[in-house]
Amino acid sequence: MPPTMSSSPSSPTFTAVQTGVSVRAKAGGSSSWQFWGRIFVVPYLLIFLVFVIYPVGYGLWLARHPDSYTRLFADPIFFRTVINTIIFVVVSVNLKMMLALFLSGFFLNTRWWVKILAALFILPWAVPSIPTILSMRFMLNPEWGVINSLIFNLTGRDGPNWLNDPTLALSFSMLAHIWKSLPFWTLILLAGRMSIPAEQYEAASVDGATTWQKFKFITWPAMSGLYLTSTILSMIWTLGDFNSVYLLTGGGPADLTHVLATLGIRYLRLDQVDLSLASIVVALPLVLPLVYFMMKRLSK
C-alpha cells in the first residue's frame, strides 16, 4: 500500500500550500489597493488637465504667431521690463536669502524676548499680500502718507513723491517683496540649522573654534544644499511675483517699473491679447532651466 501524503500543519507540503495562498492573498490585496488608488487619482488628474494643461497649451497655441514676438521686441517697454525683472530677481533673492541665513542664526537663541520677536517676525508672511502691500502704498502717499508726514514734522519740508520716481518705485517694490517673503525663508533655514547636531558645536568650542570658524566648517557645509535649493525655488517664485509690483506701483510711472509678471496686464489693458501671451511665453526660457535644475536637486 503506497504511503499517504502528510497534511499536518507541521509538514512541508502544508507549509508550501499555506505560503502560496498567503502570497496570492497579498497579491490580490495589493492589486485592489492599486485599483482604488488609480480611481482616487482620476479626479485630481482631470482637474490638473482642465485647469493647468489645457490653459497653458491653449495659451501657447494663441501665442504661436511670429508677428506677435516681432511687435513685442519692437516695444521699448519690453526691454525695460526685462532689465527690471533681472534687477528685481537678482537683488531681491540675494538680499532675502542672505538676511534669512543671518536671521536663522539669531532666532536660534532661546531667550524669551527672542521668541517674542520670532512670533512678530512671522506676521508679514502670515498676513495676506493685498492688505500688506496696500498698507505700504498708503504709507508712501506723498500727501498724507505716514512717511512724508514724519519727514515734514521733523524737517519742515515736504517729502518726495516716492512712487513717481522709477528707481525709488522699483526699489520699494523689491522692499515689499523681501519684507513679505523673508519670514518664510528664515523659517526654512532655521529648520536646517536646528537639524545640525549640537555635539558638533560643543566639540568645536572645546577646540577653541571662533563663531566664524563654526559657521564655515560646520553650519555652511551642512546647510549649503538647503540654501541652494531654497535660492532656486525663491528665484522661481520671485519671477512670478505679481502683487509686489502691481499693487504698489501698477507698473508706473509711465510703465517704467513693470516686470515680466505684470507686463501681460499692460497689454491686456491695451486689448493686445497676443502680446500679453507672447510676453508670458518669453518668460519661459527663464523659468524652465530653474525648474529643471530644481527637479535634479530634489531627485538626488
Residue ranges and their predicted role:
Residues M1-V41, W112-V114, M294-K300:
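Transmembrane alpha-helical segments of polytopic membrane transport and secretion proteins
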Residues W33-K300:
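A structural signal for multi-pass alpha-helical bundles of membrane permease subunits
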